[in-house]
């Protein structure tokens, strides 16, 4: 009789443990080339990166002493093909803080693999940014939400079941070291992808400015088609309050890099089956433009006071 076969099952992370004293990750060649190209145009070192969603790109006009770096002069930088998304980085100050605005984010439905979606974020991090404020336009699933409201993201559903992996960093060990170092210093309120304390402060600041906000869970789908009625019912059952086609890849990568994350969705429309109108991208842009005053007020106050 053959001896029994014993199986060893590992429940650990897929990476070997990395000492906390491991050297800092160095950018991969593609990222290093992009950093060099930006540094030829500005020596600005941002503290905060703001990624702007559909119809919200003109928030970058709020930057003081701006330096604009077009996406097409940055090697390896993905180019957006979506109306309302003009690809460029805008460096400057906002309420006295050093910032960089990412205008013209790219989406999975434009044909980019998930790791490419996070290249602009990784570039900003390599230039010095340690905090991410990300905005998007989303369809409202929660029946108490109305178009034009602003929702702070407290969690997400990754319905694309995709992950940026290691992005453009040098090796899995480097990113694992960053993740482990961040986890070792994270507070109990910062064990998720979104900084709940930053969110609490931001919502308080919004109330002070007279900007009413809500909180909720954001569902990411690949697009480009809007969701069917059946899909919206499914997402509602799963706990989603809003749905959109962006944000989650950047948030996942920001977390891996140890960045603090604050997410804001502009509810631009009722999701399919909850309203009577046919969903069009132009409508998303229109509502985004209508609410940009509130969002501008909110973002400036958040940058100044949190």
Question: Where do the language-model regions lie?
Answer:
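Active-site rim beta-loop-alpha module in soluble metabolic enzymes
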Residues: 192-234
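His/Asp/Glu-rich mid-to-C-terminal helical/loop segments that flank catalytic regions of hydrolases
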Residues: 271-306
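Zn-dependent metallopeptidase/amidohydrolase metal-coordination segment
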Residues: 245-283
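Generic non-transmembrane alpha-helical segments
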Residues: 37, 41, 197, 201-211, ...
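Non-catalytic positions within long, well-ordered alpha-helices that form the structural scaffold/packing
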Residues: 125-128, 236, 255
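N-terminal amphipathic/basic-hydrophobic helices that include classical n-h-c signal peptides
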Residues: 1-19
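Short acidic/polar active-site loop segments enriched in Thr and Asp
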Residues: 130, 241, 260
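Metabolite-binding pocket within alpha/beta catalytic cores that recognizes anionic/polar moieties
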Residues: 21-190
């Amino acid at each position: 009789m053959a001896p029994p076969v014993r199986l060893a099952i590992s429940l650990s992370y897929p990476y070997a443990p990395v000492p906390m004293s491991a050297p800092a990750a160095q950018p991969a060649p593609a990222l290093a080339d992009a950093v060099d190209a930006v540094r030829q145009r500005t020596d600005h070192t941002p503290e905060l990166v703001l990624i702007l969603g559909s119809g919200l790109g003109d928030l970058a006009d709020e930057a003081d002493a701006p330096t604009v770096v077009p996406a097409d002069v940055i090697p390896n930088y993905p180019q957006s093909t979506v109306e309302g998304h003009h690809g460029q980085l805008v460096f400057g100050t906002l309420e006295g803080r050093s910032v960089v605005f990412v205008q013209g984010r790219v989406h999975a439905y434009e044909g980019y693999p998930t790791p490419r979606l996070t290249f602009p974020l990784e570039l900003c991090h390599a230039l010095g940014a340690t905090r991410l404020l990300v905005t998007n336009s989303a369809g409202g699933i929660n029946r108490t939400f109305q178009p034009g409201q602003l929702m702070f993201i407290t969690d997400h559903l990754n319905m694309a079941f995709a992950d940026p992996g290691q992005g453009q960093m040098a090796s899995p060990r480097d990113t694992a070291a960053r993740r482990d170092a961040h986890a070792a210093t994270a507070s109990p309120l910062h064990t998720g992808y979104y900084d709940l304390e930053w969110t609490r402060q931001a919502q308080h600041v919004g109330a002070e400015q007279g900007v009413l906000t809500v909180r909720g869970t954001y569902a990411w789908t690949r697009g480009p088609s809007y969701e069917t009625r059946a899909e919206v019912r499914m997402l509602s059952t799963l706990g989603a309050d809003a749905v959109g086609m962006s944000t989650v890849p950047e948030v996942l990568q920001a977390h891996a890099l140890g960045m603090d994350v604050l997410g804001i969705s502009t509810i631009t429309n009722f999701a399919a089956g909850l309203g009577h109108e046919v969903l069009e991208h132009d409508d998303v842009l229109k509502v985004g433009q209508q609410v940009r005053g509130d969002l501008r007020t909110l973002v400036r106050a958040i940058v100044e006071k949190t």
